[in-house]
Amino acid sequence: MRTVQRLCVLVVSLLLLSSTGSRAQLPANELEGTWKMVSQKLVYPDSVVDRSGEWGANYKILNSTHFAWGRETKDGETVLAGGGRYEYYPERNVYIEHIQYHSDPAMSGATLRFTARVEGDTWYHIGKVGNFKLREVWKRVDPEKVRAQLRGDTVSTDSRTPE
């Protein structure tokens, strides 16, 4: 029950952060929207650790100025979250996160710089975090599919992960 409460608080926080106010927003960019992680690898000088299968639900939501992400362990016992401001320069393939809050306090205040590109509905980025490079692949969540699921038009195999 406690995990469900934490996940609900996380989802509400992410939704509030991702909601748009017309006067406060910059022009749209291709990163705006909801993304679901499909792959995460930690690339060390002598090895690669694939963490893709270690997590349950794992989403990142971006509006024109801010991002928020949240994920939980497969068993639902642990929820991690973070967010802050971001910069995106598609002409230079650069994505920068300015982390303002994080479930790991040591990450709060950090700035992470990534080489990034979007191809169709897939977002690739890689950047240095500590002593490794973080390589992630995200798929855009189709809002129409989510709306259909909420209306009951389709059946999901996992109600926590709409896509």
Segments and roles (model prediction):
Residues G84-Y88:
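Extracellular/luminal ectodomains and secreted, surface-exposed scaffolds of diverse proteins
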Residues C8-S18:
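Bacterial N-terminal signal peptides
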Residues Y89-N93:
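Short, charged helix-to-loop "capping" segments that act as catalytic/coupling loops
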Residues S19-A81, V94-E163:
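Lipid interaction determinants
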Residues M1-V9:
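Bacterial N-terminal signal peptides that target proteins for export
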